Amino acid sequence: NEKDGLIPNTEWKKNALGQNWYLGETIITGIGQGYMQTTPIQLCLMNAQIANGGYKIYPKIILDDQKQDKYKDKYIKLYKDQKNIQLIQEAMFSSTNEVMGTSYRSRIEDPKYQFAGKTGTAQVKKITAEERELDLKTFEIPYEQRDHALYVAFGPFKHPRYSISIVIEHGGSGGTVAAPLAKKLFKMIIDRHEIRKNFDTNKYLNI
């Protein structure tokens, strides 16, 4: 029951709303605002395709042996210029691992666990000019009116294996509540991967 996402453009706005597209909408769409709509799974998929260098991924929950060859050898490159992907990867790394980054407090310095990510928020209501001038803290806003907190990340950074998308309903800031959770998850997931990798199956089967 996954809902369709939406990356708006001039054609969509003309057909859906009967209105012209403005330059300012191109700018805000580039940072995920405006009419853009995504689900957490779509965010996770996009993030994974950035991590793997820009190749299309066909997500699946359970591997069906009868269909496992369906996507074999379908290495579709989504971006013409590899430099654009590298720029995004480096920007996400900086956002997490460099001072002034929005999730810097959740960084892990050990390269084994080091990840790259980006914080975000999703508004649940239109904010008026008067409300914006009040400059309220998250805890001062009624719970049901607080932004949802978002965070997407991939890791380990040098050899990406995992993509994470986190949404905390009415959590406020992604850097405050979602990124710290990602830090815990990466530590746990990578440690468990090490255990599986070092597990000698034959040793235990021969007992």
Per-region residue spans from a language model:
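Short amphipathic alpha-helical face segments that pack within enzyme cores
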Residues: 39-45, 177-184
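Short, gly/Ser/Thr-rich active-site loops of penicillin-recognizing serine hydrolases
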Residues: 67-77, 183-207
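Glycine-rich loops and low-complexity Gly/Arg-rich segments
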Residues: 55-56, 176-179, 188-193
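Beta-lactam-recognizing serine transpeptidase/beta-lactamase-like catalytic domain environment
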Residues: 1-165, 207
